[in-house]
Curated annotation (Swiss-Prot):
Binding site for [4Fe-4S] cluster: C530, C533, C538
Binding site residues for substrate: N188, M217, Y246, H282, S302, R303, G304, D343, G344, L345, R346, E382, Y409
Keywords: 4Fe-4S, Iron, Iron-sulfur, Lyase, Metal-binding, S-adenosyl-L-methionine, Thiamine biosynthesis, Zinc
Alphabetical list of Pfam families matching this protein: ThiC-associated (PF13667), ThiC_Rad_SAM (PF01964)
Enzyme class: lyase
Reactions performed catalytically: 5-amino-1-(5-phospho-beta-D-ribosyl)imidazole + S-adenosyl-L-methionine = 4-amino-2-methyl-5-(phosphooxymethyl)pyrimidine + CO + 5'-deoxyadenosine + formate + L-methionine + 3 H(+)
Protein's pathway: Cofactor biosynthesis; thiamine diphosphate biosynthesis
Purpose: Catalyzes the synthesis of the hydroxymethylpyrimidine phosphate (HMP-P) moiety of thiamine from aminoimidazole ribotide (AIR) in a radical S-adenosyl-L-methionine (SAM)-dependent reaction.
Name the record gives this protein: Phosphomethylpyrimidine synthase
UniProt cofactor note: Binds 1 [4Fe-4S] cluster per subunit. The cluster is coordinated with 3 cysteines and an exchangeable S-adenosyl-L-methionine.
GO annotation (BP), single: thiamine diphosphate biosynthetic process
Family: Belongs to the ThiC family.
Amino acid sequence: MRREGTMRLHRTFLLRVYLKESAVITYPASKKIYCQGKIFPTIRVGMREIQLTNGDSLTLYDTSGPYSDPNISIKSPQGLPRLREPWIKVRPRKTQLAFAKEGVITPEMEYAAIRENQKRELKKNTDQERERRLQGNSLSARIPNPITPEFIRNEIACGRAILPANINHPESEPMIIGRHFLVKVNANIGNSSLTSSVEEEVEKLIWALRWGADTVMDLSTGKKIKEIRETILRHSPVPIGTVPLYEALEKVDGDVKALTWEIFRDTLISQAEQGVDYFTIHAGVLNRFIPLTQKRVTGIVSRGGSLMAKWCLLHREENFLYTHFTEICEIMRAYDVSFSLGDGLRPGSIADANDEAQFAELKIQGELNRIAWKYGVQVMNEGPGHIPLNLIEENMTKQLAYCREAPFYTLGPLTTDIAPGYDHIGSAIGAAFIAWQGCALLCYVTPKEHLGLPNKQDVKEGLIAYKIAAHAADLAKGHPAARQRDYLLSQARFEFRWHDQFNLALDAETARLFHDETLPKEAAKHAHFCSLCGPKFCAYKTSHEVRDTLQKVT
């Protein structure tokens, strides 16, 4: 399936999904490589290596899993190889948090550490002045170089990071979420009652993996919820999250009043048995907080939050997710499912940002964190929402304080309400800012936000916007693995190595397409100009001439 030579190196992304055939992801000028573990020598961590025309190469964090390995054939319904199964079989049935607290480094922890480092070491001849000038400001975060398995173990033990890895999802490749690591991006997929099929959702999953989704949430609310989730899990090398409330509500035909703790509990167990890695649980929406939303412009915009608020009012009882929280912890501990404590009262408009209802729920999230940790369950906290730039820092500061530095997972935040059709841009601005402040996981927003169910193109555009935001934050934080790609691309740009510029880009296909709109011939890929400035006004070309003149003078 791989073609050699120049044409192979310059090919754009190919994705084919047939439920009875192979699914393949390829990247231009790239090959799949594996890094071996040291503590656990049988570990092989997949990465992507980009080959450059000047002989250099770049190793990248890779979310594509076996789909980009030409030596692995993936067919449905069997799904992916069960990578973690041998590790799980030979050890006690404990959570990653329990192992971490006991001082035990698991294979998953070493795997995640190797991924974070991306085979990257600082060169001995690094420009020290440049390093001092560009070193990041991590805002009290501690990012070691290199990141070790012991560091990951300690971060998990302290509750500052999670490694979501259900024992029944052995296909997943271990990854770490926390503010002392690379900023991660989540993609939402899933059908609705009006559209989408099992095949379409698997295709969206693999498409999301190709564009860098670190985690994926299946938010299906229509028919075949269980079948879609099972197929997604068996075909996903990244952690899968869900909102169990959606399926529980489907079981009672959408009748909120008919929903019970018992129905929800059975749904929770069923999804944990399937292998879901993290659950969004809206346990912080309490009776006494609901009246606080009355003055809001947009009320309660979280689906789960609004459903639980309605349930509380119909039954005149406290939220059963809160009253049964310890039982939920026991279920999740049995499978090593992580909490993603839902922000059911997040603001859905700039007018409602940072209000009393939002922060009241955040405080409860902090209390629930401590209960989850007591039960040995990993936990992260979901956050807003719609927040203007000047109020974002307060969100991060309060989350760190209330939730004792547990990972923060935010939807954006959107920094303005006026961008329907472009909310992926308005929210990526907020995402970059809050990720620099310490947010660990960014939930992408697509151009269809507020408008409809995303299609494949929307998924791509949302992920590209958020990978830019995450990378910008990693640069600002000074993550040791962040800057090399920027350096190599800038070098290629200055040296007019057009193919390398394209291949180092987040979206090589679009970069090449834009260039070729006006200069499509192969000769233009070696020209010392582009169509923006032409041969006479290219600043890079002139800069080379200036350098040559200076060298002659000196």
